[in-house]
Amino acid sequence: MRSKFKDEHPFEKRKAEAERIRQKYADRIPVICEKVEKSDIATIDKKKYLVPSDLTVGQFVYVIRKRIKLSPEKAIFIFVDEVLPPTAALMSSIYEEHKDEDGFLYITYSGENTFGSI
């Protein structure tokens, strides 16, 4: 999936911003979170997050649910490189495995399991 954030910001600018963030906040992970294009789930109010490195994927999903005001009975799926990451995985390990060459971790979310699991 193509990232709107990548389309709107040139690579050099994104890379410089991610480096600045990592220097200033060494224990945090720069994350870009965007909705899967064709999903009918609500659009999130902000794309950029500074996530504590010891946060789990499940805790991050909880943050996203709150930001889009998703009711408890509705499902949400998050994807990294079009794969569902394990809920118990630490964001720091996901970042190390999947960070983009610009230094950001790109996460997409959807109301349906559009890609499948590992």
UniProtKB/Swiss-Prot annotation:
Covalently attached lipid (Phosphatidylethanolamine amidated glycine), positions: 116
Subcellular location field: Cytoplasmic vesicle, Cvt vesicle membrane; Cytoplasmic vesicle, Autophagosome membrane; Vacuole membrane
Propeptide section residues: 117-118
Knockout consequences: Blocks autophagy. Leads to reduced conidial germination under starvation. Especially, leads to reduced CP15 levels in conidia. Also exhibits enhanced sensitivity to oxidative stress. Impairs growth of the mycelia on host cadavers and considerably weakens virulence.
Origin superkingdom: Eukaryota
Record site: Cleavage: 116-117
Keywords: Autophagy, Cytoplasmic vesicle, Lipoprotein, Membrane, Vacuole
UniProt cross-references to Pfam families, sorted A to Z: ATG8
Membrane topology per record: Lipid-anchor
GO biological process, one term: autophagy
PTM field: The C-terminal Ser-117 and Ile-118 residues of ATG8 are removed by ATG4 to expose Gly-116 at the C-terminus. This Gly-116 forms then a thioester bond with ATG7 (E1-like activating enzyme) before being transferred to ATG3 (the specific E2 conjugating enzyme), in order to be finally amidated with phosphatidylethanolamine. This lipid modification anchors ATG8 to membranes and can be reversed by ATG4, releasing soluble ATG8.
GO cellular component terms, semicolon-separated: autophagosome membrane; Cvt vesicle membrane
Biological function: Ubiquitin-like modifier involved in cytoplasm to vacuole transport (Cvt) vesicles and autophagosome formation. With ATG4, mediates the delivery of the vesicles and autophagosomes to the vacuole via the microtubule cytoskeleton. Required for selective autophagic degradation of the nucleus (nucleophagy) as well as for mitophagy which contributes to regulate mitochondrial quantity and quality by eliminating the mitochondria to a basal level to fulfill cellular energy requirements and preventing excess ROS production.
UniProt family annotation: Belongs to the ATG8 family.
Subunit and interaction comment: Conjugation to phosphatidylethanolamine (PE) leads to homodimerization. Interacts with ATG1, ATG3, ATG4, ATG7 and ATG12.
Identification of the protein by name: Autophagy-related protein 8
Lineage: Eukaryota, Fungi, Dikarya, Ascomycota, Pezizomycotina
